[in-house]
């Protein structure tokens, strides 16, 4: 939440971003306003210096309201380094920043199929300016959340499925592999 009236920005899987206002009122009516639409399955959102960034399945999008009318006029491709195929399960989830302003998100693997692109089942780091990205760790089936701590450590969850019976939370280490063989690439990933 941000701003004087404690408003929130919310994204939906259907491709919309909404602003919710009135959250600071003890009782009363919330106001919902759709400000952006047409994005590819956005499942992560981060506000940095009053600018909304949205993590979509195909890219991180920076939203611009050029004429201050409360609706987005320009959808900027901030970074689209991560690759995606047509498979239904390849969600890109969450969007967090570290103390230096770099972005982090989780990229799901192909459900019950081997990975086709290097980003399947990975945690991705994107530079503050959006010019480059790195795969931090992989071995995830459906990572559905990332938490970045002030000390630089971070965690990511992974959803249960046919390979693990419960959701779990992982302390993420650089170049770590977290067990889901559908995102394993021989010669790249640790034995």
Q: Which positions does each model-derived feature cover?
A:
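Beta-propeller domains with acidic blade repeats across secreted/periplasmic ectodomains
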Residues: 1-191
């Amino acid at each position: 939440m941000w701003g004087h009236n404690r408003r929130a920005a919310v994204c939906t899987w259907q491709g919309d971003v909404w602003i919710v206002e009135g959250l600071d009122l003890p009782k009363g009516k919330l106001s919902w306003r759709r400000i952006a639409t047409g994005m590819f399955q956005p499942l992560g959102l981060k506000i940095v210096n009053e600018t909304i960034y949205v993590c979509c399945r195909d890219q991180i999008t920076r939203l611009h309201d050029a004429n201050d009318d409360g609706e987005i006029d320009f959808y900027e491709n901030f970074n689209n380094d991560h690759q995606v195929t047509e498979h239904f399960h390849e969600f890109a989830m969450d969007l967090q920043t570290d103390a230096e302003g770099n972005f982090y998100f989780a990229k799901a693997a192909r459900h019950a199929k081997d990975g086709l692109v290097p980003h399947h089942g990975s945690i991705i780091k994107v530079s503050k300016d959006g010019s480059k990205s790195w795969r931090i760790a992989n071995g995830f089936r459906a990572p559905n959340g990332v938490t970045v701590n002030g000390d630089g450590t971070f965690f990511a969850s992974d959803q249960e499925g046919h390979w693990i019976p419960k959701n779990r939370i992982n302390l993420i280490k650089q170049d770590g592999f977290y067990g889901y063989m559908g995102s394993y690439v021989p010669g790249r990933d640790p034995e």
